[in-house]
């Protein structure tokens, strides 16, 4: 590394006047490891820290902003500054934070007030994280200052929970003992956020509130608080006793809310559900210290007040999720059976099989609100199941089949129909069904082929295929177009406004602009579900073909949109090729055309199956010349010697060519194989001249065929039949053949005709 570098003092002097890119350059320079030098500590680095402290203590907000950024960069990349001046910088930053918190209303009203609080809180959090797990720094610089930092952060959490709660959560988890004196104050702030402002908070902030409330139960309970009976003092106190107390307190608050639903639905019609509700855990109100939520105020004359039921259940579900999902420094006891029973009860609160109370059936507005809130009540059970399955996995394996059976209750059906899905309601529950598919995918990954429930899977496939289409917002407008046109003709043209006509023209001329498209996260969940279904079941023809159409059409659309096919669709196409279903409908050609540029190994193997090269051998099998023939091995390695006679020179030449062709024969090629002789009489054997004469005299009427004798090195003889074209000779009349048989026998020299010679030359 070069020893030439910018002096720290030069950078420190320019900090006060630096702006924009110059300030960014200074921060980038301070990150260099050149400045990690003990020789610079007393002079150069101390001067830099002095300038940083001056910026932090300045009354100018921009200088404060620069001082916070510089202190964070210096402490993060220079261990010498962190070890020697980290506590001093932390104290200066949190003192300014405390000062700004006291004047929160005036500071936040400025244009940069939100950003100023953000940099102050993040700087404190970063320096605290840098000091943690360092024994000396933590003991001497961090812990003493936390006692002053925590109250300021708790006060500010009332106004900026999204910024402050993550910092307090880390401090509460790591420094539980230091946080203990401020537990009641922090609990009061959290309860106020839960009771008054919870519905107005964002999803992320709501989760932070519930997690901080759960982490307050890390503090151990005093012995005097557990029991006043001295006889129970010898019992073992578990490390999670306070945590379990809070968990059971939240779990027990579900039962009163569910019992309120008994005023809407007739639970007595389902004895099993009624027994489950009675079995839910309950804690006496006198011993329940966690009971802080106000009672619900419901009025059937004001139907919208019924929305408080799903809102309260959602709050309790968020708090219960925090208790069962957060990491803790000790093992905890989670009542999985009680949570599963609670979820079954929540899924059972449905008008699918339970009737409404008689006195509520006539009010249409009330019935509309009830039909809207019941799926939201069921959805809280699905959320709890999702967290339980994701966090505890196979620990709840015994509950999985029951969970799938209960999920069927969440699928809406049309009234007075034979299991016909109400897709209008399904379209309004798209977000909820995304959670359902995540839950089902996790369950099926554990069950796999052991599952025999196909009815729920078939219904979920229909729901997934319906929700996979982009939602058009103006479908209902086109359906009612005729009635709208009639109403428009009745109205006077003078009352029509040009602005309204222009707005409606966009709807009718560009309907594709009023479409809600699905996200890739949604497609990924659905594709995982389809892959699991195809792997584990043989689906009926209709849903299977619908899945094929979905995968092909969506792949084409996404390829045109993004320029490539997403990975989840590639996996789905691969699964469809490997599992064609009962109809044996293969989409291999279509899949190959879609994925021709991906170079997928599986599709290439299916199109061009190949045997591994190391397993291919050229085998030379022995020739079978009949029952009397002997096996000849290694014909290609031996030389054949022929005995030619003067009377059949031409025949010997042709025979020699045949032998040469025989030597070049390779067994794997069918065209060179020697045909097997089936007729034993057609086998030619060696015989002497005397045998020929005797045979001539006894059977002179038979036609004699020429054979050629050949000898092999090992003494064995191989008789090769001369292949002569006899097609024309066979076509001769029988009379000529009889005359030839009556003639005296002699061995003539075979003279080939011109036609036959031409054919042999061509061969």
UniProtKB/Swiss-Prot annotation:
It comes from the Eukaryota. Keywords: Acetylation, Nucleus, Ribosome biogenesis, rRNA processing. It holds the Pfam family RIX1. InterPro entries: RIX1_N. The modification N-acetylserine is found at residue 2. Transmembrane segments: none annotated. GO terms for cellular component: nucleus. Its main location: nucleus. Residues 736-763 have a biased composition (Acidic residues). It is found in: Nucleus. Residues 718-763 are annotated as: Disordered. GO terms for biological process: rRNA processing. PANTHER family: PROLINE-, GLUTAMIC ACID- AND LEUCINE-RICH PROTEIN 1. Belongs to the RIX1/PELP1 family. This is Pre-rRNA-processing protein RIX1. It comes from Saccharomyces cerevisiae (strain YJM789) (Baker's yeast).
